[in-house]
């Protein structure tokens, strides 16, 4: 068994320092303000996926795999909110955001590559970040604030996206 000197909590990293190092490692011009809408998830041991919205309003992604960060990649879009991300099985994750049209859009990673943006509809308030959760393989829940100020919910039941329901 390792001694307590050999085992300890992972080192703490300031998020703004991490994002600065990720963005600066890219060949693009550094953003004029801190990235917004930070979200993170993990879908397996030794892996951490980080998402943010940059000055270009596109969604950006970088992954830490076995302690090393990948180069940031643009996932596109013109986000009007921060991202919400959830892993729902090993090697699978989904990211959500509200776009300028007031609809919820998503992209998902299937373990091989990113699928294109897909609209999940809705009449949502722009600028308000949705929330996402998963309580099992093939089950996703996403929550967002509607233009009516109420909370709306939509979920993936393993075969399809169930229509929006108003929660209150």
Protein language model regions, located:
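A structural motif
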Residues: 2-168
């Amino acid at each position: 068994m390792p001694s307590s000197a050999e085992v300890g909590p992972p080192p703490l990293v300031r998020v703004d320092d991490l994002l600065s190092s990720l963005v600066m490692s890219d060949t693009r011009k550094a953003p004029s303000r801190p990235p917004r809408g930070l979200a993170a998830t993990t879908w397996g041991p030794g892996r951490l996926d980080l998402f943010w919205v940059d000055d270009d309003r596109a969604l950006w992604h970088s992954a830490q795999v076995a302690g090393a960060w990948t180069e940031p990649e643009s996932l596109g879009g013109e986000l009007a909110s921060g991202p919400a991300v959830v892993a729902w099985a090993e090697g699978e994750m989904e990211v959500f955001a509200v776009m300028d049209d007031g609809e919820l859009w998503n992209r998902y990673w299937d373990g091989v590559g990113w699928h294109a943006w897909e609209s999940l509809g809705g009449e949502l308030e722009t600028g308000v970040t949705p929330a996402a959760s998963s309580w099992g393989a093939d089950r996703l829940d996403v929550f967002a604030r509607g233009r009516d100020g109420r909370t709306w919910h939509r979920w993936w039941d393993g075969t399809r996206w169930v229509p929006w329901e108003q929660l209150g």
